[in-house]
Amino acid sequence: MDLLTDPRKRRWLGWGSLAVVFLLVNVHRLSTAVLSERLTTDFAISAAQLGTLHASFFVVYALVQIPTGVLADRYGPRVVGATGAVVLSAGAIAFTLSDGYLVAFLSRALVGLGSGVIFITMLRFCANWYRVDEFGTMAGLTAGIAGLGAIVATTPLAVAVSRFGWRPTVFALAVLGFLAGVAVFALARSSPADAGLDPIENVPEQPSVSLAETAGYLRELLTDREQWLLAVIFFSGMGTILTIIGLWGVPYLVVVHGLSVTAASYYTLLGSVGILIGAPTVGWVSDRIGRRLLPMVVGLGAFALTLAVIPIVGTPPLPVVALTYFLVGFSLGSVMLSLPIIKEEYPPEASGVATATVNGAGFFGAAVLPAVMGLALDRYRTGDVVAGAVVYTEFGYRVAFAITTIAVAVAFLCSLRLFVRE
């Protein structure tokens, strides 16, 4: 069968199996928004504990990025990807069996541990199977899967949870994860040579790298000024996108615009659609024009200007909010260009650890920025409680969104610095 013997076709089977796992990663990552009420009731936890439960995923996810890069370079995407799928699914099953906060917290962290290896593994797979001028497109397409997962984590997940309950629904996701892990082990070979196939023209051979060589590349990365600028871009950009779409985007609409939670979720759904469209589109454009920094600078500048509408106006018309949320998601494409930029600065055998250092910064941003926005909201809250929820103010949200706007503006300035030096 050509599908198995033609390396240009076979690579899509491997990428597709990893993509299924990555979709599940993003469903688990954003599921707490839909599950929040049930988790609060089942585990008898406060809002602060719920926030900590949510953050446990991101903290562990961020911490494993550099080790994942080392492992992906050393052992290849087949072993690391399949192991990650098994670990995150085991964590999901443990989560469904949790009878208290501590077990739930540790289970959620285990999901983050397994999930944390998948994206870097996919990038390593793409480096092994796709040409350099295809990598930006593939990185964007891979990020687009995150948008699809975010969509599944909204209304579809809510319907499933409402009909079957949250524990059976999460258990079903875990079973699917185990099956996807088997598919990864069977199909996602480390390279065409590893699959017994002819090499793909213009795809550089990815030699195995020793731990000593990896340590050398890591030391070089930690002293690389360009890497730190890209890390700031990813911290600010990815952190802002996940914070708005994954957490504060809905409460802002509920408090400031008076929408129901269900109605507000449609706006964050637009953000997820923006991710689905923007990431592969910007990656494709970057590959076609052979430029990385130009679309990054333009995209981040538009991101900052778009986001500034909320802190400046406070209560913009809902169609403007809808467009803002969509463009926030679409901007992920520009943020994602950080990864092919850093990958292309280092030898092929260092692609895993190089992309991991930048990618990890994004998920530290996803853990830090929600908390900083929360501090701003607490500073300006009224002190009233309605239906068990703390009442925040429009001014508090303006300050909170100003924080993310400043973060994105800093990312824009970092990209401009890189562009000028190009």
Regions found by a protein language model. Give the residues of each.
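Cytoplasmic helix-loop-helix junction between adjacent transmembrane helices
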Residues: 105-148
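Cytoplasmic membrane-interface "Motif A"-like loop-to-helix N-cap segments
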Residues: 74-85, 287-301
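Flexible cytoplasmic inter-helical loops of multi-pass small-molecule transporters
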Residues: 186-216, 422
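Extracytoplasmic gate region of multi-pass secondary transporters
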Residues: 32-33, 219-283, 370, 374
